[in-house]
């Protein structure tokens, strides 16, 4: 799964995409001649049947790539005369995709998350969804669909996701006689537990604070305290990024590191939070589903729970998501839609065992919303109703540089209020 906000495209790349897309005036294709349930197409009659090649670009490698290749083969079996060419771009995904769009030779279907950068080169899917009820759009979680919209249009369908939860070591809790956390716990409960679970002689800590945290992930704590980094319309940061509530949410982590009930991790010459949790040197660690299997393999007796809440305020979540989209310059849009639809169908989802299912029906069938380890991810998903900043302002990349510098300094113990005020002042020019 591509973690959202893990990479940002250069401004030149975004400009290139905008220019390229502006030259393309392709219209949405319909879904006439397609099966409503099997993901098959009905080829036009022809004396000579030629193989149609559909290109699918992915950022995945290894086992996840193998699964996607298997999905492609299944689609080919359902659609004789169709060849799905799976193109593994790996770490060069963005560069190769931009080059393909620039050459007007993009893959027909591709993994996607960065809709602010790529939307001008993508095919809006609203009309496809409207004309084709077999996609069962209401079977997707609404929060995931919200992350696939930009400027009022739907540019992708959800493929995989993770929310963030607290992983906790049951053995360490029990040894310290600290009650296991529950879904109604507060930040005061969290801080108390972290302090009790810290045993410095054993180099054991209650929690780990990332010294250079991703501001994207921090949004859920700010939202949960009733604020945000930017206004809902994306036009203001004064009174949002530097609000009392924002500073309070960020200060929690700085204070944990300051009183030594949390260890700073992930920075230069610092340890990995994941490694420490697997070694039972951390009692709690916030993370996504991607670490779950590695914790199992390390034989850690762990549980998961939703993030703590601020008093009298509902908890909020932020989503790391991957989606699939269609290129506006695709010459096989109808077939691309059928493949996209098959990829996010119940069958396609069940094949992608490394991803959390994105369809409500699959989750209920597998009873993941009742599984103690997986239920917190879905409860947090249902709380993920806010829109992340990068989808609200096209200049968020520039604004975020100033915010990130402030956040990193806050984690090192500097004053949150002063640093956030400076970040707002330095970023005002990007809002004009």
What residues fall within each predicted segment?
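Extracytoplasmic "Venus flytrap"/periplasmic binding protein-like
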Residues: 74-140, 175-177, 274-276, 283-284, ...
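Long, aromatic- and glycine/proline-rich binding clefts that accommodate carbohydrate-like moieties
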Residues: 305, 354-405, 409
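Glycine-centered hinge/linker elements that transmit conformational signals in sensory
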Residues: 194, 235-266
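Short, low-complexity disordered leader/linker segments with a strong preference
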Residues: 1-54, 77, 425-432
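Extracytoplasmic/periplasmic substrate-recognition and gating elements
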Residues: 73-78, 83, 176, 258-259, ...
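Hinge/lid segment of periplasmic solute-binding proteins
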Residues: 113-165, 221, 303-305, 370-375, ...
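Conserved C-terminal helix/tail region of periplasmic/extracytoplasmic solute-binding proteins
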Residues: 40, 174, 180, 255-260, ...
């Amino acid at each position: 799964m591509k973690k959202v906000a893990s990479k940002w495209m250069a401004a030149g790349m975004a400009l290139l995409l905008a220019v390229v897309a502006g030259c393309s005036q392709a219209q949405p294709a319909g879904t006439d001649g397609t099966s409503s349930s099997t993901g098959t197409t009905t080829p036009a009659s022809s004396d000579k049947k030629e193989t149609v090649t559909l290109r699918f670009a992915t950022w995945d490698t290894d086992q996840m790539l193998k699964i996607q290749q298997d999905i492609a083969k299944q689609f080919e079996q359902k659609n004789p005369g169709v060849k799905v060419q799976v193109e593994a771009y790996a770490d060069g995904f963005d560069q190769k995709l931009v080059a393909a769009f620039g050459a007007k030779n993009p893959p027909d279907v591709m993994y996607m998350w960065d809709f602010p950068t790529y939307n001008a080169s993508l095919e809006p899917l609203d009309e496809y969804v409207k004309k084709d009820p077999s996609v069962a759009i209401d079977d997707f979680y609404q929060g995931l669909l919200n992350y696939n919209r930009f400027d009022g249009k739907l540019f992708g369908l959800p493929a995989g996701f993770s929310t963030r939860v607290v992983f906790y070591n049951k053995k360490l809790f029990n040894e310290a006689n600290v009650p296991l956390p529950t879904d109604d716990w507060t930040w005061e409960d969290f801080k108390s537990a972290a302090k009790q679970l810290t045993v410095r002689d054993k180099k054991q800590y209650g929690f780990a604070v990332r010294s250079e945290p991703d501001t994207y992930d921090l949004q859920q704590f700010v939202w949960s305290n009733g604020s945000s980094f930017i206004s809902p319309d994306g036009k203001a940061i004064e009174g949002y990024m530097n609000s009392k509530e924002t500073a309070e949410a960020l200060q929690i982590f700085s204070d944990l590191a300051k009183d030594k009930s949390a260890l700073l991790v992930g920075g230069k010459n610092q340890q990995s939070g994941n490694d420490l949790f697997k070694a039972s040197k951390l009692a709690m660690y916030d993370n996504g589903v991607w670490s779950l299997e590695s914790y199992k393999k390390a034989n850690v007796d762990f549980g998961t729970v939703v993030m703590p809440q601020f008093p009298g305020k509902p908890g909020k979540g932020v989503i790391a998501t991957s989606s699939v989209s269609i290129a506006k310059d695709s010459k096989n849009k109808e077939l691309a839609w059928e493949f996209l639809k098959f990829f996010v169908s119940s069958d396609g989802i069940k094949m992608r065992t490394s991803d959390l299912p994105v369809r409500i029906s699959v989750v209920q069938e597998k009873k993941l919303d009742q599984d103690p380890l997986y239920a917190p991810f879905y409860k947090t998903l249902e709380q993920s109703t806010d829109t992340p900043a990068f989808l609200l302002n096209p200049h968020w990349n520039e604004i975020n540089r100033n915010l990130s510098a402030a956040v990193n300094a806050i984690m090192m113990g500097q004053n949150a209020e002063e640093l956030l005020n400076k970040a707002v002042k330095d970023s005002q020019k990007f809002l004009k």
